[in-house]
Curated annotation (Swiss-Prot):
This protein's record includes keyword Cytoplasm: yes
Protein name: 3-isopropylmalate dehydrogenase
Site (Important for catalysis): 137, 183
Gene: leuB
Domain of life the protein comes from: Bacteria
Organism of origin: Bacillus cereus (strain ATCC 14579 / DSM 31 / CCUG 7414 / JCM 2152 / NBRC 15305 / NCIMB 9373 / NCTC 2599 / NRRL B-3711)
Length: 354
């Protein structure tokens, strides 16, 4: 298989974890006979420094012409007072790609379960599906005076149906349960959300559906996260709940994410930030970036075997006791990456020997 991947290393630790992603992809090429064209482009703060814009037209054009986009990290205090903010580039990139579904799998490795704030954390295995295009972030009018500020929350039926349908399709491949989170006891948009969800559910009779109010859901994520399989919710609720869910893994350096469009390339990135305090120190945890690569291989390219090989190698290295400082170890970004690559090669040799 031959695919073009645009690599947006970005800021902070982004270039370091992107290098780990590239090394993993090179090993996949070698082990499975694929070829990936890796195209580097400027994005975020580094793009502001060079071009004055966080998302140069050249970068967006390259992304649109690609088969998938990998993003390292964006932002940092260096640009806090800048006229253009790096984070604006991420919103513009999402809009330019037309992505509507942000997907965050939340799992906990048995080797690092003790780092989770919860007991029995190794039983956690769910996915948060967040709608990205509608809701209070993108609805108008938005107004502010000295005395009054107004935001508008609008959702169209087609936006709800599109994201909920995606969630049901995903659940149909997993444990066959969808939890829709809303505030239907108060908000008109949530009442429509619940109605459309029930209509979509009729098309998936083998998938269980439940509705939970967002305040109760925030509590259940901590009290009983094992009840969830696929969570689907609107933009604001998803923004908050996905961040809450991310702490269950014990470190932000562990979890990947994907943002999908109806057509065209998807965007894959670790959920952690740019971590400017450790940038350039070879301390960043590359696991979330590696898992983002695994998601890309499986979800965009249909290379499930190759994606699984990365996941298995990461798990094996963690079980061996090797880990970076954020999860209690002494490995560097490069040494942990090297260990994963060696494990991939060893597992491939064992598999062929059988």
């Amino acid at each position: 298989m031959e695919k073009r991947i645009v690599c947006l290393a970005g800021d902070g630790v982004g270039p370091e974890v992107m290098e780990s992603a590239k090394e993993v992809l090179h090993m996949v090429e070698r082990l499975y006979g694929h070829h990936f064209h890796l195209q580097d482009e400027y994005f975020g703060g580094v793009a502001i420094d060079l071009t004055g814009q966080p998302l140069p037209q050249r970068t967006l054009a390259a992304c649109l012409a690609s088969d998938a986009v990998l993003l390292g990290a964006v932002g940092g205090p260096r640009w806090d007072s800048a006229k253009e903010r790096p984070e604006k580039g991420l919103l513009a990139l999402r809009k330019g790609l037309g992505v509507f579904a942000n997907v965050r799998p939340v799992t906990v490795e048995s080797a690092t379960a003790h780092l989770s704030p919860l007991k029995n954390a190794d039983e956690i295995d769910f996915v948060v599906v967040r709608e990205l295009t509608g809701g209070i972030y993108f609805s108008y009018p938005k107004e502010r005076t000295e005395e009054v500020a107004t935001d508008t929350l609008t959702y169209h039926r087609h936006e709800i149906e599109r994201i909920v349908s995606y969630a049901f399709q995903l659940a149909n491949k997993r444990k066959k349960k969808v939890t829709s989170i809303d505030k239907a006891n108060v908000l008109e948009s949530s009442k429509l959300w619940r109605t459309v969800t029930e209509e979509v559910a009729l098309r998936y009779p083998n998938v269980e559906v439940e509705h939970i109010l967002v305040d109760a859901a925030a509590m259940e994520l901590i009290r009983n996260p094992g009840r969830f399989d696929v969570i689907v919710t609107e933009n604001l609720f998803g923004d908050i709940l996905s961040d809450e869910a991310s702490v269950l893994a014990g470190s932000l350096g562990m979890l990947p994410s994907a943002s999908h469009a109806e057509k065209g390339p998807s965007l894959y990135e670790p959920i952690h930030g740019s971590a400017p305090d450790i940038a350039g120190k070879n301390k960043a945890n590359p696991i979330a970036m590696m898992r983002s690569v695994a998601m890309m291989l499986g979800q965009s390219f249909g290379l499930t075997r190759e994606g699984y090989a990365i996941e298995e190698a990461v798990s094996a290295v963690l079980k061996s006791g090797k880990c970076t400082a954020d999860i209690g170890g002494t490995e560097t970004t490069t040494s942990f990456t090297k260990a994963v690559i060696q494990e991939m090669e060893e597992q491939a040799l064992v598999g062929r020997g059988r």
